UniProtKB/Swiss-Prot annotation:
UniProt keyword tRNA-binding, yes or no: no
Bias (Low complexity): 107-124, 266-288
Coiled-coil region: none
Name assigned to this protein: Krueppel-like factor 13
PROSITE patterns, sorted: ZINC_FINGER_C2H2_1, ZINC_FINGER_C2H2_2
Organism field: Homo sapiens (Human)
UniProt function note: Transcription factor that activates expression from GC-rich minimal promoter regions, including genes in the cells of the erythroid lineage. Represses transcription by binding to the BTE site, a GC-rich DNA element, in competition with the activator SP1. It also represses transcription by interacting with the corepressor Sin3A and HDAC1. Activates RANTES and CCL5 expression in T-cells.
CDD domains documented for this protein: KLF13_N
């Protein structure tokens, strides 16, 4: 408001100063020093100068009048004090909502209902029917590989401690547990040194603790090479030798060995297995 009043006052002063024209007097000279021809020639030019000044003054007055009209059309912004007063007035007009009073218990059964606090008017709205609240994804549903590995490790440890694996080694310092008694029996031979599987090849007196070890050894006598490379068709006696060889090829993929599995692949899993599980006894006489 003060700025607008100052601008109006300044514009009014400009109008007053422009309306009162200053009279310009020429230099005073004696009548003797000025020739008559010069005085006569100067008199016609005075009205032209006055006309130019009148035109300039009227143009400037018109510009100032337009400025004043524009200022009057613009509404002044309210002061901060007026804004606070208006906000306080609006706040005083709006009624304050108070929560309803708690009903007084009239019977012993109503005391439990009265113990619950009343729901205020500003409580959060309940979710609509058919809409479930968002749930944070657990570690099992996350897509991070690190979390998946942790979950798998936790599951494997839980499987080891599960009651299904009840066949435990009774030797001191050995905490291995197996799900089948045959697996435990094969493991106990590592402690006792028992080797019930003997080679029946002529002049070969080797014995083994597991039947798969005997079958692997027997192929050294027969020369059987049933594990063939899927790329170069080389053959090997043991599946682990085939795997090492196949990895040297540039176009090798682990799925190649799995596709060519068949019956021979399933029977050769014990060749490179590190488990203590015992496989069915293979009679050397049945092999070619």
């Amino acid at each position: 408001m003060a700025a607008a009043a100052y601008v109006d006052h300044f514009a009014a002063e400009c109008l007053v100063s422009m309306s009162s024209r200053a009279v310009v007097h020429g230099p005073r000279e004696g009548p003797e020093s000025r020739p008559e021809g010069a005085a006569v020639a100067a008199t016609p030019t005075l009205p032209r100068v006055e006309e130019r000044r009148d035109g300039k003054d009227s143009a400037s007055l018109f510009v100032v009048a337009r400025i004043l009209a524009d200022l009057n059309q613009q509404a002044p912004a309210p002061a901060p004090a007026e804004r606070r007063e208006g906000a306080a007035a609006r706040k005083a007009r709006t009624p304050c909502r108070l929560p309803p009073p708690a009903p007084e218990p009239t019977s012993p059964g109503a005391e439990g209902a009265a113990a619950a606090p009343p729901s205020p008017a500003w409580s959060e709205p309940e979710p609509e029917a058919g809409l479930e609240p968002e749930r944070e994804p657990g570690p099992a549903g996350s897509g991070e590989p690190g979390l998946r590995q942790r979950v798998r490790r936790g599951r494997s440890r839980a499987d080891l401690e599960s009651p299904q694996r009840k066949h435990k080694c009774h030797y001191a310092g050995c905490e291995k547990v197996y799900g089948k008694s045959s697996h435990l029996k094969a493991h106990l031979r590592t402690h006792t040194g028992e080797r019930p599987f003997a080679c029946s090849w002529q002049d070969c007196n080797k014995k083994f603790a597991r039947s798969d070890e005997l079958a692997r050894h027997y192929r050294t006598h027969t020369g059987e090479k049933k594990f063939s490379c899927p790329i170069c068709e080389k053959r090997f006696m043991r599946s682990d030798h085939l795997t090492k060889h196949a990895r040297r090829h540039a176009n090798f993929h682990p799925g190649m060995l799995q596709r060519r599995g068949g019956g021979s692949r399933t029977g050769s899993l014990s060749d490179y297995s590190r488990s203590d599980a015992s496989s069915p006894t293979i009679s050397p006489a049945s092999s070619p």
